[in-house]
A protein has these predicted regions:
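Active-site proximal beta-strand in glycosyltransferases
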Residues: 48-76, 94
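A conserved, positively charged/aromatic
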Residues: 80-91
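Phosphate- and divalent-cation-binding pockets in alpha/beta enzyme and binding domains
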Residues: 102-106
Length: 122
């Protein structure tokens, strides 16, 4: 449970969020809870899973940085995707739909080679 606890702690301590993770029950937050509930702890070893936030402070150089995006392109929390410097620090950007992925590619010109689309987990 060490890896899952690390991810949850980081999500809850993210000050760039308008509301703490523990107090938020939006779709993206609930999908993260569902993912953590059903995958074994070792699945998250060496992974820095970042939910809907492009805060530079959340990047961990020694881990694989995965930004999981559920927000739309106009949300303040993800505006750093417009920064090449920030995007270069990410290993993967995961989207919850093809539609959302296409909007981000158009808006931020993010590299498709760093992007993946998964369907909603719930």
């Amino acid at each position: 449970m060490e890896e899952k606890s690390r991810i949850l702690k980081k999500a809850n301590e993210d000050q760039s969020r308008p509301i703490s993770f523990n107090d938020s029950f939006g779709g993206g937050d609930n999908q993260l809870r569902f993912l953590l509930k059903h995958l074994p702890d070792e699945s998250f070893k060496d992974i820095n899973l970042i939910l809907n936030s492009t805060n530079h402070d959340l990047i961990e150089k020694e881990k694989i940085n995965v930004l999981w995006v559920h927000h739309f392109v106009n949300q303040a929390e993800i505006t750093n995707l417009g920064s090449k410097e920030y995007v270069d620090k990410l290993d993967w950007i995961v989207f919850n739909s093809n539609w959302n992925f296409e909007k981000f590619v158009y808006q931020f010109k993010i590299p498709e080679s760093k992007s993946a689309v998964i369907r909603n987990a719930i």
